[in-house]
Amino acid sequence: SKSASIVMLTELVERGQAKCAQYWPNDGILTFGDIEVEFLSVNESEDYSERDFKVSNRSDNNGSQLIVKQFHYHGWPEVGAPVSGYSMIELVEDVQKQQQNSGNHPIVI
């Protein structure tokens, strides 16, 4: 798939329990078998982070690469619901813009 958008709605750890493994580098490159994930940039807002990665398949002789944007939402409390839905609406708007700019491929959630 040529998904260019990832939406992550959980933290790595919540209430002392691991919820998600960090599959992205904070800097440089992480390698998973033939797949390389290279950190490009991060934009932090109050309730979510936008990270850009370059994903490459080292076994592909054509040098295929994909720029992927991850939207990591931090505004959802561990228990209950957010006080305001405004930041979630902002997140959805930013994801929609990304989708339009990247070819409207499936979103990984």
Curated annotation (Swiss-Prot):
Keywords: Hydrolase, Protein phosphatase
Family statement drawn from the similarity comment of this UniProt entry: Belongs to the protein-tyrosine phosphatase family.
Residues annotated to bind substrate: E78
Superkingdom per UniProt: Eukaryota
Limits of the Tyrosine-protein phosphatase domain: 1-109
Gene Ontology MF terms in the entry: protein tyrosine phosphatase activity
E.C. code: 3.1.3.48
Entry keyword Hydrolase: yes
Provenance organism: Styela plicata (Wrinkled sea squirt)
Catalytic activity: O-phospho-L-tyrosyl-[protein] + H2O = L-tyrosyl-[protein] + phosphate
SUPFAM superfamilies named in the record: (Phosphotyrosine protein) phosphatases II
The protein's name: Tyrosine-protein phosphatase 4
InterPro entries to which the protein is assigned, alphabetical: Prot-tyrosine_phosphatase-like, Protein-Tyr_Phosphatase, PTP_cat
UniProt entry tagged with the keyword Hydrolase: yes
